[in-house]
């Protein structure tokens, strides 16, 4: 089982992640992605879904038109782990490739 990050490690990881922040009231990180339109937002979600499935680590997310709101936390560990940081990095790379 993967271990939950310490507060210091989580803060350090967030410094390296663009646009991500701690979610108030939860041991989780979050970010909103905004795309040109719904098709691009859905394409992003599709690409992330393939990565998430391969890693067996899935985001909490919602999509409204061209915005995708993401929350990452590892339920089995009760908070943010390296799995969340790695998925956040992958999401950032996918979003950047679509810009």
From Swiss-Prot:
Name of the protein in question: Putative pterin-4-alpha-carbinolamine dehydratase
Keywords assigned: Lyase
Family: Belongs to the pterin-4-alpha-carbinolamine dehydratase family.
Top-level lineage group: Bacteria
EC number: 4.2.1.96
InterPro entries for the chain: PCD_sf (IPR036428), Pterin_deHydtase (IPR001533)
One BP annotation, GO: tetrahydrobiopterin biosynthetic process
Enzymatic reactions: (4aS,6R)-4a-hydroxy-L-erythro-5,6,7,8-tetrahydrobiopterin = (6R)-L-erythro-6,7-dihydrobiopterin + H2O
Pfam families with a match to the protein in the record: Pterin_4a
GO molecular function (one): 4-alpha-hydroxytetrahydrobiopterin dehydratase activity
Keyword check for Zinc: no
Organism: Bradyrhizobium sp. (strain BTAi1 / ATCC BAA-1182)
């Amino acid at each position: 089982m993967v271990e939950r990050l310490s507060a210091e490690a989580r803060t350090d990881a967030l410094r390296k992640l663009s646009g991500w922040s701690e979610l108030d009231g939860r041991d989780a990180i979050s970010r909103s992605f905004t795309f040109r339109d719904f098709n691009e937002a859905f394409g992003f979600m599709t690409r992330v879904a393939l990565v998430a499935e391969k890693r067996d680590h899935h985001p909490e997310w919602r999509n409204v038109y061209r915005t995708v709101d993401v929350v990452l936390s590892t339920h089995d560990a009760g908070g943010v782990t390296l799995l969340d940081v790695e998925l956040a990095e992958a999401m950032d790379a996918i979003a950047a490739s679509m810009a």
